[in-house]
Amino acid sequence: MSAFNNFVNFVANIVAPMQRQFINFVRIAICIVMVWIGGLKVCQYEADGIAHFVSNSPFFSYMYKKGPNLVDDGTGKMVMEYTLHKNPEGKMVAKNIEWHKENGTYTASYIIGATIVTVGLLTLSGIWFPVSGMAGGLLTFGMSIVTLSFMITTPEIWVPNLGGDMPTPAHGFPYLSAVGRLIVKDVIMMAGGLVAAAECANRILARRKAI
């Protein structure tokens, strides 16, 4: 037991002084994710790929002209219009792309992407500038709340029951689809944003006390 305690103390003595560096790594990680994903919002496939989030969201659906509209899918079933114009990743369908242009899909994606990149850079700036870093961390937290709200508003979050030649018991809540598994990870971004913001806030207060 003594050997184990000595090992724990050895590791703790190495890790403890590196707290600031680890928090900076959190900032770098947040920035990488946000700049990469935000930057991809200028790409057609990524813009098309967020149509289900935007169309179903009470916070973002106003950005689209047609996506949230209910239309007949040709079988008498009323569905949201965006569902008739999905482009699978890696597949280019001209009529769907034209619809997305008319819908404002790409313009909305550019705005969302620019916002995400900005928040990522603000969070990264906390390494050197605590005020902007605190803002970035809090915005990361807020953005994560909005993203996680998609789990309530977006039907594609859950595995659908598509039928088959045998029962499909694993569908609906709590069975996350690939889309849902992507979104739920924003809980980590939310926590990281708060950690980054709190560390910046402590530096701001420490500097003001020193004056």
UniProtKB/Swiss-Prot annotation:
- Location(s), subcellular: Cell membrane
- Keyword Zinc present in the record's keywords: the answer is no
What is this entry's stated membrane topology?
Multi-pass membrane protein
Q: State any GO CC term.
A: plasma membrane
State the name under which the record lists this protein. Uncharacterized 23.0 kDa protein in purT/mpa1 5'region
Q: Which family does it belong to?
A: To E.coli YkgB. To H.influenzae HI_0219.
UniProt-listed InterPro entries: RclC-like (IPR007339)
Alphabetical GO biological process terms? response to hypochlorite
Per its UniProt entry, which superkingdom is the organism in?
Bacteria
Keyword field = Cell membrane, Membrane, Transmembrane, Transmembrane helix
Q: Does the keyword section mention Cell membrane?
A: yes
What transmembrane ranges does the database entry give? 22-42, 111-131, 133-153
Q: Which organism is it from?
A: Mannheimia haemolytica
